[in-house]
Amino acid sequence: MLWVLYFLTSLFICSLIILWSKKSMLFVDNANKIQGFHHARTPRAGGLGIFLSFVLAYLLESFEAPFKGPFVFLGLSLVFLSGFLEDINLSLSPKIRLILQAVGVVCIISSTPLVVSDFSPLFSLPYFIAFLFAIFMLVGISNAINIIDGFNGLASGICAIALLVIHYIDPSSLSCLLAYMVLGFMVLNFPLGKIFLGDGGAYFLGLVCGISLLHLSLEQKISVFFGLNLMLYPVIEVLFSILRRKIKRQKATMPDNLHLHTLLFKFLQQRSLNYPNPLCTFILILCNLPFILISVLFRLNPYALIAISLVFIACYLIGYAYLNKQVCALEKRAF
């Protein structure tokens, strides 16, 4: 029944943040940002509730690999801090933020086995290259979750599903407790958006999911490609965003409002549908679920997982092209 404790702890801390923010305006978000799709000044420190619940679990539980040890806790804290500073309006440059995240990930990888070198049937890597690739993957998935954190419940919903799937595969993991911490936050976030996850929460959840999946891969409970498939939507979103900005000769770190979820939001909004923000989340998670469930069935079959990922990428590109065309056409008519 400890999951009840962590669920309520997360819910309680997030509730306190909402009340405190109304008085101090400390954690409130800027509704005028280019990637913003809300109007009210809303606290964006929901990740603090999840992280402090994790700290409580760290003190009360006997953590096993891959979350065992002070350096793992230090690394997770550094990655959370890299985003939380932004949440309290103490901005870091994208370069400094990435460096802080990389240092945190190195702390983790240096103290617990997370380096995957065998990517059969595609390739294998020497240990040093695999070590660097592990850093790239963990920093990458942390930022990927942050990129899709645009609407109520989207990033947290994807992570909650991932953590519950991980628990299904490995019931001995702590992923179930982490999932309930996320759900405690989601009570206040979805559908009405009383509080946002924030950069710190998004980075932390992305890293936790990445660590868990690499660990399961090394334990040979899943193919390494299953981890990719489980988080494929945020991964494709960040890679496609980088490619899109490179084509436009923009900085890869420059924010914009051309993500799949923002196009879907505009599409729903143009059709005057009620509650387009939570509806956008519901549609995207519903579209992801079939691919996740099929991947679970083939979690040890790399060939099937690669095929599933290619089908998902094709669906993503078709969906993106359709939404972009529809949104542009309707915007032209408006003028």
Regions found by a protein language model. Give the residues of each.
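"…together with the soluble PPM/PP2C metallo-phosphatase catalytic core" -> "…together
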Residues: 1-239
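Cytosolic, membrane-interface loops and tails of multi-pass inner-membrane proteins
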Residues: 19-43, 240-275
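Alpha-helical transmembrane segments and their membrane-interface junctions
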Residues: 56-61, 281-300
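Alpha-helical transmembrane segments and their immediate juxtamembrane interface regions
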Residues: 78-90, 94, 100, 301-335
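Membrane-interface starts of transmembrane alpha-helices
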Residues: 93-96, 126, 198, 275-283, ...
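Hydrophobic alpha-helical segments
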Residues: 267, 271, 289-296, 300, ...
